[in-house]
Amino acid sequence: MWLSILAIFCGAGLGALLRTGFNLLSVGVASVIPLGTLISNMVGGYLIGIALAFFGNNPHLSPEWKLLIITGFLGGLTTFSSFSAEVVTMIQRGEFTWALGTALLHLVGSLVLTLLGIWTYQAIK
């Protein structure tokens, strides 16, 4: 149990650091939508597709690897709460079109990139 907790803890810390890096890189970039959150969710969507395909094809790996990568790292990288707060802020400012566009971009983009990640793994396997 302690190894599982450690795997999640380490993965989440690394994922959160990468998300912070994406946010810092997007500071000063002229954009109506928060790019750091979008990049985090798109990269996370792609990587989880690869991870799902990888772990599905490698069931012999210890469960701690899946906890490290999917639950920890990708859980720390992707951010539904920040996305939700940003969209609600747009709605509160009356930016309904931007709010809808941002929500659709995150949802559709993440789903498409998850599929692309699965297909990428299958192509290189």
UniProtKB/Swiss-Prot annotation:
Domain of life: Bacteria
One biological process term in Gene Ontology: cellular detoxification of fluoride
Protein's membrane topology: Multi-pass membrane protein
Keywords per UniProt: Cell inner membrane, Cell membrane, Ion channel, Ion transport, Membrane, Metal-binding, Sodium, Transmembrane, Transmembrane helix, Transport
Compartments (UniProt record): Cell inner membrane
Activity regulation (record text): Na(+) is not transported, but it plays an essential structural role and its presence is essential for fluoride channel function.
Bilayer-spanning residue ranges: 2-22, 35-55, 68-88, 98-118
Binding site for Na(+): 75, 78
Recorded catalytic activity of this chain's protein: fluoride(in) = fluoride(out)
Xref: InterPro entries: FluC (IPR003691)
GO molecular function: fluoride channel activity; metal ion binding
Pfam families referenced in this protein's UniProt entry, alphabetically: CRCB (PF02537)
Cellular component, GO, one term: plasma membrane
NCBIfam families the record matches: crcB, PRK14196.1
Family note: Belongs to the fluoride channel Fluc/FEX (TC 1.A.43) family.
Function per UniProt: Fluoride-specific ion channel. Important for reducing fluoride concentration in the cell, thus reducing its toxicity.
Protein name: Fluoride-specific ion channel FluC
Organism listed in the record: Polynucleobacter asymbioticus (strain DSM 18221 / CIP 109841 / QLW-P1DMWA-1)
Gene name linked to the record: fluC
